[in-house]
Amino acid sequence: MLSSQFEVVRIDGEDYRHRGLPNAPSPLPDDAALDAAVEQHFAGRRVAIDDFDALVEHLSRVHPSRYRALIEGLDAIAWRGVRTIDQQAVALRFVVLADRLYDRDLPILSTGVPFDRVFTEEMMAGGYQKKYYRAVSRLTALAREADEA
């Protein structure tokens, strides 16, 4: 078997995609600050402003292949009340959304928990950890873009 010819070596460390970059911006403190940031950075542009719980609930009713259509024509995303996701199925759907947002390079503004806490510690250490770390990395990059807009 081919796999018997190789040794798996795990290399942990800083995400190379974020080396030399400023720290991820903190979530905005409240809805009023979110509204002001949307107006300041994205006035006159198409911004989807959603409650995080309503968003993840909606994702459960839409097939992931349709997530691209959900964000079609948008210039930015704003989420109110981002929280830690504690259900694996919900988290995996959210990963797909994060990938679609990253593919479209859509800046994200948010309130609630920072994106590095959107998945539980157990998820970040479990079988899908690569997916979760990728999603956190991508969401962080998109939050930086919004902060710089």
State each model region's role.
Residues A76-A149:
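Terminal-proximal interaction/regulatory segments of ATP-powered molecular machines
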Residues Q5, L70, R138, L142:
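Residues that form generic nucleotide/phosphate-binding pockets
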Residues M1-V47:
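Interdomain motor-coupling "hinge/lid" segment immediately C-terminal to the ATP-binding subdomain
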Residues L2-E7, G73-D75, R104-L106:
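Short glycine-/polar-rich loops that comprise or flank the Walker A/P-loop
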Residues P22-P27, L55, T120-M124:
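Charged, low-complexity surface segments at secondary-structure and domain boundaries
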Residues E39-D103:
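Conserved helicase/translocase motor-coupling segment
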Residues L34, R66, L70, K131-A135:
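Alpha-helical structural motif
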Residues D15, V56, A146:
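Residue-level detector of flexible, active-site-proximal loop/helix-junction positions
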